[in-house]
């Protein structure tokens, strides 16, 4: 049969080929094997495409049919569904068709309400999402900013600092992260805060911090001496630090204090030099600055220098003696030299006497102009550098000349320029004779900058330059960038902050050092909050007590949301360190609170504890938050969080040291204490809490196999119906239960049905009847169990809560097995 079929097919093919060859108009097409294969693949793919849908339908039918689903019936139902009645436009009606008009109006009202509700819901969702993202981004932004020590150009400064390695100083886990200097500073801060909190007079924080410098090197001692000198000014009454710092009187005081520090430092330097070279110095005569300078010049100018003018006094150049007496800050000694050489100095004696007797070391405008004219005509190119320097200081002229022959060190240059700074503008001074403090500050900070002062080798020099020119914030920010000097920078900032001399950034998202619109050109602001938080981050996890002392300085500061920074920092500190009991206190068994470290700083600890609890709650630390709210006597929040914690563990099997066991013990302790002390919370929350505890007891009995006791508990709770008459009542009552109860409904129903089924099997397993248990009693009990099971099934179907399909299936299965 097959051979005949193939033979017939072959005959037809040969006949077709012969007919094709007989048509001469058609060209012959010849294909190689590859082309034939490609054509075959194309034909095959077309065939597969046509049959793939049919194959998919067959596979779907096989898969779903094995589960008892008829796919053809489902397809017919889906095709029969139409959205026309929902989404098609309403049909126009005649004006006289009242029924149609009313129907259209009703449909329009429904559609409008649905659309309005949809728009409102989507709008609220968008708004909540936007607010959530803004809050989250603000938190991320703060974390990013706090990880950056500096910003702008400083953030890209990768210059390697030449400092010793501190690898050997790394503390083991559990030890303090503070080194000896930082710990010494922390002790002084503790002493300071103790005095403040106790209501004593505010101690001098500069002196407390300066005492730490005795443990360190001379540079630190000099730094604190300078800080003490510069902060010893009388502030003018003002609403904020900017207005006070910008006042002419305060700025003049800063210059005066800086000059005093530089002069005293130089005098100390001359003393050290002279006593180190007593043989060459030949110190003698009446003790005083004059004799000290004479001895110093024996060392500095042992031989006559060419170009010095106007003779000598006791073997030393006149102008050199005058200059160095002024450099040591002793104008009386300089006046003594002027008096001895008055015949060689012309009018200078008169000018110097006026300069010395003036309140602010300033000549009258007429005398100043006269001296400047004399300087320009006769002294600008004078060969005596000391004479030029003295004239430039007294007349405050020729500010472009740095007098490098005399002022060869940075301190000398600072002293010279600060002497030339003027504050009043009488209009008579030419630009080359007028130097303002702002100009000098800009020159040092921006024109010269860090690169000019080789800050890596001499960091304290640049700090001194900025600090002595009243650029406190820039000086602190610079020193803070160096790890080994950071603690000193922070405590200088604390001193200025307490003295109300520090210019703080208006926002905490600002850079560590910033310039805000409206501020004078050379005024910088320091992000004090960020500075302090960056410093404490190093040790807040290992030394939370010390960190708390530093956070107390932020008690009057607010963040961008108006939140108290002390509260915020304390809450973050507690969450990070987990030292709840030590910082916030501990709840004793009798319900009293054992004070914590925070009690030293405030008498009302509830706001702080509530704040920490709120932060813990927002971070999802519900158990810790519940304990903290309990500490703050906030019963509503305690039970609300306990309900959230207990709900997921209610149906679990209890085991020693398990999550459920710990939470159950915690809840029982709270319940016993609240009942003993008569503490009550919101009625709804309170009833939910005690119902959850009863359900835990129910499941514990159920899992232990004590089904009769478990049944008695569920019967008393009236949570599920155990007869047909109470189904409606239980369904109505179910609407009043909280979500924490509803989430456990499936497990409660299954456990109750299991109890009924177990009792049913036990009943069936007993002997048919006995004297004590007649057949009728067994039948009545059998009927009762079936009725109770049917009530549970009815209840599960009527409640407005979506139980899982598996739960319903198991309930029905057990109910069927009982019938």
Swiss-Prot record:
- MF term (GO), any: structural constituent of nuclear pore
- Give the modified residues of type Phosphoserine: 52, 66, 72, 75, 80, 430, 767
Q: Which UniProt keywords apply?
A: Membrane, mRNA transport, Nuclear pore complex, Nucleus, Phosphoprotein, Protein transport, Translocation, Transport
- Superkingdom classification of source: Eukaryota
Per the record, the GO terms for biological process are: mRNA transport; nuclear envelope organization; nuclear pore complex assembly; nucleocytoplasmic transport; positive regulation of SMAD protein signal transduction; protein transport
User: What kind of membrane protein is this, topologically?
Assistant: Peripheral membrane protein
Q: Which GO terms describe its cellular component?
A: centrosome; nuclear envelope; nuclear membrane; nuclear periphery; nuclear pore
Q: Which residues carry this modification: Phosphothreonine?
A: 49
UniProt xrefs under InterPro entries: Nucleoporin_int_Nup93/Nic96 (IPR007231)
Localization per Swiss-Prot or TrEMBL: Nucleus membrane; Nucleus, Nuclear pore complex; Nucleus envelope
Subunit: Part of the nuclear pore complex (NPC). Component of the p62 complex, a complex composed of NUP62 and NUP54. Forms a complex with NUP35, NUP155, NUP205 and lamin B; the interaction with NUP35 is direct. Does not interact with TPR. Interacts with SMAD4 and IPO7; translocates SMAD4 to the nucleus through the NPC upon BMP7 stimulation resulting in activation of SMAD4 signaling.
The family line of this record is: Belongs to the nucleoporin interacting component (NIC) family.
Q: Which PANTHER family would you find in this protein's record?
A: NUCLEAR PORE COMPLEX PROTEIN NUP93 (PTHR11225:SF4), NUCLEAR PORE COMPLEX PROTEIN NUP93 NUCLEOPORIN NUP93 DEAD EYE PROTEIN (PTHR11225)
Q: What does this protein do?
A: Plays a role in the nuclear pore complex (NPC) assembly and/or maintenance. May anchor nucleoporins, but not NUP153 and TPR, to the NPC. During renal development, regulates podocyte migration and proliferation through SMAD4 signaling.
Name of the featured protein: Nuclear pore complex protein Nup93
Organism lineage reads as:
Eukaryota, Metazoa, Chordata, Craniata, Vertebrata
Gene name, please? Nup93
């Amino acid at each position: 049969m097959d051979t005949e079929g193939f033979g017939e097919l072959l005959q037809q093919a040969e006949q077709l080929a012969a007919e094709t060859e007989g048509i001469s108009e058609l060209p012959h097409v010849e294909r190689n094997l590859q082309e034939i294969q490609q054509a075959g693949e194309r034909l095959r793919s077309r065939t597969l495409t046509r049959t793939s849908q049919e194959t998919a339908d067959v596979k779907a039918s096989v898969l779903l049919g094995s589960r008892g689903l008829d796919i053809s019936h489902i397809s017919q139902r889906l095709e029969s569904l139409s959205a026309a009645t929902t989404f098609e436009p309403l049909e126009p009606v005649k004006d006289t068709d009242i029924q149609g008009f009313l129907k259209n109006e009703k449909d329009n009202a429904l559609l409008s309400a649905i659309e309005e509700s949809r728009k409102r819901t989507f709008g609220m969702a968008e708004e909540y999402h936007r607010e959530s993202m803004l809050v989250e981004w603000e938190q991320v932004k703060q974390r990013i900013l706090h990880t950056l020590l500096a910003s702008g150009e400083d953030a890209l400064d990768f210059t390697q600092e030449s400092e010793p390695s501190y690898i050997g100083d790394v503390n083991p886990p559990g030890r303090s992260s503070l080194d000896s200097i930082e710990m010494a500073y922390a002790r002084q801060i503790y002493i300071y805060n103790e005095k403040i909190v106790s209501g004593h007079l505010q101690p001098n924080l500069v002196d407390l911090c300066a005492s730490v410098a005795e443990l360190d090197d001379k540079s630190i001692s000099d730094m604190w001496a300078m800080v003490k000198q510069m902060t010893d000014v009388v502030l003018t009454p003002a609403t904020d630090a900017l207005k006070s710092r910008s006042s002419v009187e305060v700025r003049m005081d800063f210059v005066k204090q800086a000059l005093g520090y530089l002069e005293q430092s130089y005098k100390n330097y001359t003393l050290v030099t002279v006593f180190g070279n007593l043989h060459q110095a030949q110190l003698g005569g009446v003790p005083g600055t004059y004799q000290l300078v004479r001895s110093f010049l024996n060392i500095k100018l042992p031989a006559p220098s060419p170009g010095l003018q106007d003779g000598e006094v006791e073997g030393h150049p006149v102008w050199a003696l005058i200059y160095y007496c002024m450099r040591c800050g002793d104008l009386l000694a300089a006046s003594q030299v002027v008096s001895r050489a008055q015949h060689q100095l012309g009018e200078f004696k008169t000018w110097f006497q006026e300069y010395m007797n003036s309140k602010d070391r300033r000549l009258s405008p007429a005398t100043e102009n006269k001296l400047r004219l004399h300087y320009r005509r006769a002294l600008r190119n004078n060969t005596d550098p000391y004479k030029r320097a003295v004239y430039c200081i007294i007349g405050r002229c020729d500010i472009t000349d740095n007098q490098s022959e005399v002022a060869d060190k940075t301190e000398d240059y600072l002293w010279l320029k600060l002497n030339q700074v003027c504050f009043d503008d009488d209009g008579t001074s030419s630009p080359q004779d007028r130097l303002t403090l702002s100009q000098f500050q800009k020159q040092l900070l921006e024109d010269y900058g860090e690169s000019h002062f080789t800050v890596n080798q001499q960091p304290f020099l640049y700090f001194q330059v900025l600090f002595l020119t009243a650029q406190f914030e820039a000086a602190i920010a610079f020193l803070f960038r160096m790890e080994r000097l950071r603690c000193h920078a922070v405590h200088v900032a604390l001193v200025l902050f307490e003295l109300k001399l520090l210019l703080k950034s208006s926002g905490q998202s600002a850079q560590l050092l910033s310039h805000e619109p409206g501020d004078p050109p050379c005024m910088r602001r320091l992000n004090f909050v960020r500075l302090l938080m960056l410093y404490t981050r190093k040790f807040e996890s290992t030394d939370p007590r010390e960190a708390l002392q530093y956070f107390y300085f932020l008690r009057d500061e607010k963040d961008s949301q108006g939140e108290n920074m002390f509260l915020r920092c304390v809450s973050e500190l507690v969450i990070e360190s987990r030292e709840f009991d030590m910082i916030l206190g501990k709840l004793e068994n009798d319900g009293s609170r054992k004070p914590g470290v925070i009690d030293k700083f405030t008498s009302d600890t509830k706001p702080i504890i509530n704040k920490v609890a709120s932060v813990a709650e927002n971070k999802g630390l519900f158990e810790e938050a519940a304990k903290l709210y309990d500490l703050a006597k906030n019963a509503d929040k305690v039970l609300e969080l306990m309900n959230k914690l207990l709900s997921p563990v209610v149906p679990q099997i209890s085991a020693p040291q398990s999550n459920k066991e710990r939470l159950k013990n915690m809840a029982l302790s709270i319940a016993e204490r609240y009942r003993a002390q008569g503490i009550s919370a919101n009625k709804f929350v309170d009833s939910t809490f005690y119902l959850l505890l009863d359900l835990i007891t129910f499941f514990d009995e159920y899992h232990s196999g004590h089904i009769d006791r478990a049944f008695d508990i569920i019967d008393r709770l009236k949570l599920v119906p155990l007869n047909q008459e109470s189904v409606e009542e239980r369904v109505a009552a179910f609407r009043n239960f909280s979500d924490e109860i509803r989430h456990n409904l499936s497990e409660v129903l299954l456990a109750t049905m299991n109890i009924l089924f177990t009792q049913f099997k036990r009943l069936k397993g007993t002997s048919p009847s006995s004297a004590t248990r007649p057949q009728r009693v067994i039948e009545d009990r059998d009927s009762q169990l079936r009725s109770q099971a049917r009530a549970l099934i009815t209840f599960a179907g009527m409640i407005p809560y979506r139980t899982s399909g598996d739960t319903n299936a198991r309930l029905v299965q057990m109910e069927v097995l009982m019938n």
